[in-house]
Amino acid sequence: MDNRGSSQKGSLLLLLLLVSNLFLCKSVASLPICPSGAVNCQVSLRDLFDRAVILSHYIHNLSSEMFNEFDKRYAQGRGFITKAINSCHTSSLSTPEDKEQAQQIHHEVLLNLILRVLRSWNDPLYHLVTEVRGMQEAPDAILSRAIEIEEQNKRLLEGMEKIVGQVHPGIKENEVYSVWSGLPSLQMADEDTRLFAFYNLLHCLRRDSHKIDNYLKLLKCRIIYDSNC
């Protein structure tokens, strides 16, 4: 890895350390969130958004690095990219494709859409980690990122639930998500089929993490700064 890549990764890790346990109701010496003995811990909406944006950006960077590593090691010359277009399990969720489309959507709808996308990745991320562990000579650069993304996706989902609870208190959101049925493909005996299944899943993860990152930045600007940013 070149110096620029090492520096970027170091910066991202530092940001993550700064917001470790960022959505947990704990009192931290440098950032006292809850008074001693508090029962219902509340983090400010601005802090929640700040931390969610940092975390979503971290997840997107990890997913991009993991996809690029897999592409370099396993996908060269196989023509996978032409088959991967519009074949994500989350395609059933109607998500805006760019910032202009997202700006036309009410923030309540966009918040719930983020929740649905994050929930749609719980199952595939769990199985991704399991199946990568089972790969012969699985590269640590891929496995370590898969493990980290699975953990941070759960943390981001928890944070988003807190954000929705503050923006729309009292509203119970149905746990709607897009079901993933790609496990058999990750376990196929045919190498080309199996590698494409991994490639496609990582391609979709990179795509969706980028969307969530953009949606959160837009929502933070709209809700926290009244679109004045």
From Swiss-Prot:
One GO cellular component term noted in the UniProt record for this chain: extracellular space
Pfam families: Hormone_1
Xref: Gene3D superfamilies: 1.20.1250.10
Region forming the signal peptide: 1-30
Cell compartments where the protein resides: Secreted
Family matches, as SUPFAM superfamilies: 4-helical cytokines
Residues glycosylated per entry: N61
Listed InterPro entries: 4_helix_cytokine-like_core, Somatotropin/Prolactin, Somatotropin_CS
Positions carrying Phosphoserine: S56, S64, S120
Function: Prolactin acts primarily on the mammary gland by promoting lactation.
Subunit structure: Interacts with PRLR.
UniProt-recorded name of the protein: Prolactin
Gene: PRL
